């Protein structure tokens, strides 16, 4: 049949589909027979309902299903024949006029857009560099030591000493306090606690509480005013000033493990002691630097691609991406243990901007991969899997885990494709190298 495709706009199209009702006769008979085998009706044994009654009860529904199935089949057949680059699924609408001989549908759909790739040579991106030295390793080890911190009462002799002669609370100390707050001499909800534990200097307490606690010894108390802002979430105290009194119940100083072979062993370094531990810490920091640098560069390149390339975005693809993001949000809520998260009413509109950007970038990347032959090779995929596997205790098992699942392999392939696009982009654009410290790198977004 001659294909009629009408241009309804930038990407919107309409295809008119026609087929003879007679083409569905055999399928209709078979479908009704299948329905009849399981049909139940009073006065008849199951599966023994006369054909005319099956036809009367289910004929219209069967016609509806078969016509839509046939229209969909014909649409995809003709779209492939005409070389139509589809963006999403069609919306099929039967013509309102009834024709005894034929069935006519209108298929409304979108086509993939033309992607106009911009001039990458005019773009500039920043590539950060960071050197890991002894100071960075020492800071990382300090963080690991703090994970094994334990506390001893100030002034009491123990296996690690007494914490010094000063028994007053200091920054870094773990304190246990009771406190009570009053407004106009009356206690208020949420303004009282007993055995409240925190570490001074970590910012868990309000600054006024920390300032009042510093310098106090066990058994000592102190009162201080605290003004609640006008927009405070607790309406009963918003805009008011409370008088708090704290009493210190215990003051404990922090003892950190010594960086020695025993400490290395506690981190799983069974051979090589401190030397091997420092080497492994450096290796982990180097890996983190590479990951962070790559993430920052990728984010900037993607933003540049988004601004340099021109295309119309198919609404159908954006809608599908919004639904994926909604489902992802529900899954996240479920993992957090939120009640009834599976059916949470999350409006797709809140993801409109994010979904549009994702679809744009997906189409741009596809165009670049196709035009510049940036496909992911088997060697590249293997190299990426091998590198990811090195961070695990049993790399060989992790490698097998990747190759056992086509979905996981596809994720790796997409990651390699993105890397290929970034390499191509940076080969065309101006890249400014910028050296930063590890701490500075960690704070960059």
UniProtKB/Swiss-Prot annotation:
Reactions it catalyzes: [protein]-peptidylproline (omega=180) = [protein]-peptidylproline (omega=0)
Domain PPIase FKBP-type: residue ranges: 172-257
Stored Pfam families: FKBP_C, Trigger_C, Trigger_N
Organismal lineage: Bacteria, Pseudomonadati, Pseudomonadota, Betaproteobacteria, Burkholderiales
Entry similarity comment: Belongs to the FKBP-type PPIase family. Tig subfamily.
Keyword Cytoplasm among record annotations: yes
Keyword Cell division part of the UniProt annotation: yes
MF (Gene Ontology): peptidyl-prolyl cis-trans isomerase activity
Alphabetically ordered keywords of this record: Cell cycle, Cell division, Chaperone, Cytoplasm, Isomerase, Rotamase
Domain remark from Swiss-Prot or TrEMBL: Consists of 3 domains; the N-terminus binds the ribosome, the middle domain has PPIase activity, while the C-terminus has intrinsic chaperone activity on its own.
Localization, UniProt: Cytoplasm
Record EC number: 5.2.1.8
GO BP term, pick one: cell division
SUPFAM superfamilies: FKBP-like, Triger factor/SurA peptide-binding domain-like, Trigger factor ribosome-binding domain
Alphabetized InterPro entries for the sequence: PPIase_dom_sf, PPIase_FKBP_dom, Trig_fac, Trigger_fac_C, Trigger_fac_C_sf, Trigger_fac_ribosome-bd_bac, Trigger_fac_ribosome-bd_sf, Trigger_fact/SurA_dom_sf
GO CC annotation, single: cytoplasm
Biological role: Involved in protein export. Acts as a chaperone by maintaining the newly synthesized protein in an open conformation. Functions as a peptidyl-prolyl cis-trans isomerase.
Top EC category: isomerase
Entry protein name: Trigger factor
């Amino acid at each position: 049949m001659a294909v009629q495709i009408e241009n309804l706009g930038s990407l919107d199209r309409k295809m008119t589909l026609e087929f003879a009702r007679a083409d569905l006769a055999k399928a209709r008979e078979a479908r009704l027979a299948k329905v009849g085998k399981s049909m139940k009706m009073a006065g008849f044994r199951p599966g023994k309902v006369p054909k005319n009654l099956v036809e009367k009860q289910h004929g219209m529904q069967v016609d509806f299903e078969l016509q839509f199935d046939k229209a969909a089949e014909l649409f995809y057949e003709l779209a492939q024949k005409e070389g139509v680059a589809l963006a999403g699924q069609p919306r099929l609408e039967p013509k309102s006029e009834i024709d005894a001989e034929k069935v006519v549908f209108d298929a409304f759909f979108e086509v993939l857009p033309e992607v106009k790739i911009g001039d990458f040579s005019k773009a500039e991106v920043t590539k950060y560099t960071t050197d890991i030295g002894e100071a960075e390793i020492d800071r990382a080890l300090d963080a690991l030591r703090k994970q094994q911190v334990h506390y001893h009462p100030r002034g009491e002799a123990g296996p690690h000493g007494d914490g010094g002669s000063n028994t007053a609370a200091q920054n870094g100390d773990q304190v246990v306090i009771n406190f009570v707050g009053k407004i106009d001499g009356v206690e208020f909800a949420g303004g009282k606690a007993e055995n409240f534990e925190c570490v001074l200097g970590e910012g868990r307490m309000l600054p006024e509480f920390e300032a009042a606690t510093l310098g106090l010894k066990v058994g000592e108390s102190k009162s201080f005013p605290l003004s609640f802002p006008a927009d405070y979430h607790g309406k009963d105290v918003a805009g008011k000033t409370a008088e708090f009194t704290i009493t210190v119940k215990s003051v404990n100083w922090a003892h950190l493990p010594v960086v020695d072979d025993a400490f290395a062993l506690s981190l799983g370094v069974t051979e090589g002691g401190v030397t091997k531990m420092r080497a492994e810490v450096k290796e982990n920091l180097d890996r983190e630097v590479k990951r962070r640098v790559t993430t920052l560069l990728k984010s900037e390149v993607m933003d540049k691609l988004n601004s340099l390339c021109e295309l119309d975005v198919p609404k159908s693809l954006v809608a599908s991406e919004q639904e994926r993001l909604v489902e992802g949000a529900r899954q996240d809520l479920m993992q957090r243990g939120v009640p009834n998260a599976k059916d949470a009413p999350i409006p797709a509109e809140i993801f409109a901007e994010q979904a549009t950007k994702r679809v744009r970038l997906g189409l741009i990347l596809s165009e670049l991969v196709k035009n510049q032959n940036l496909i992911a090779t088997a060697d590249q995929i293997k190299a990426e899997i091998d590198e990811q596997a090195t961070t695990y205790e049993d790399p060989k098992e992790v490698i097998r885990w990747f190759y056992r699942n086509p979905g996981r392999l596809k994720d790796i392939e997409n990651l390699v494709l993105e890397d290929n696009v970034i390499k191509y982009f940076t080969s065309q654009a101006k890249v400014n190298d910028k050296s930063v410290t590890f701490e500075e790198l960690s704070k960059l977004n």
